[in-house]
Amino acid sequence: RPEESSYQADMHLYMKILRCNACHERQPLTPPRSDIRAHFSSSGEDLGDEGRVPPALNGVGRKLTRGALKKTIQGAMPVRPYMNTRMPNWGDTHADILTEHFIESDLETDEKPTPRKGRENQVGRNMWGRALMGIDGLGCIQCHPLNGNRSLGIQAMDLKHSSGRLRAPWFRDYLMDPAKFRPGTRMPSFWPNGNPSLKGHGGSSERQIDSIWAYLNELGQSRLPLGMESKGDFMLKPERRPMVFRTFMKDAGLHAIAVGFFRNFHVA
């Protein structure tokens, strides 16, 4: 294993003193014990471990903005209302020290800006992002609430928090390969091997992800995605063409894919 930097060594010592690893995983520290993990619970249905176990802290200094990271350590930025375990408030001093150590340990110096400044012909567009979020796109709203509006399926994390919490380069890399950052996640990859699974809406993976980021940054002044504006009682009705709905079904499995046809014949 490569030798730890002074920031990493100090941070890991600090985490041990505060016992952060009693609830959070952060390599190379000892992860939470199984008997402790058994006490974590969730009020959300069908969210699995992601809904009950506090998130890992691997790379968190690259994931969260400085302000969001400090607020999180202070317990002042709860974004997982379904998680029954709550983050304590460690106060300003501990929060400042840990925030600095996380950022110095994790943040990369050669990050690409997103959207990419000076390359306006390749950056995202709000309208593409809105389309990708909806049921005729990638269907993000099937699992994620948006600005307080309920999702069509399970109630995972509200994406309204994304632009204020996350660093854009981390967001881009996470969407490309969610399982790399969170092994066992139910979040699918819509850009396998860097290639878009859906044509249009900017065309390239780079443009599509930038478009989603642009939409989330302008969420307060944008229309809701198709399927959420007038979702009614969450009934999805295929009309012109079959509709694909990724969800978690009791009899079909955790990564079920339901396909609805306009003649009331459906498969999963």
For each feature predicted by the language model, list its residue ranges.
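A generic secondary-structure signal for well-formed alpha-helical elements
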Residues: 18-22, 27-31, 77, 106-110, ...
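Electrostatic cytochrome c docking/interface patches
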Residues: 1-16, 30, 108-135, 224-228
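The canonical Cys-X-X-Cys-His
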Residues: 1, 17-28, 69, 87-88, ...
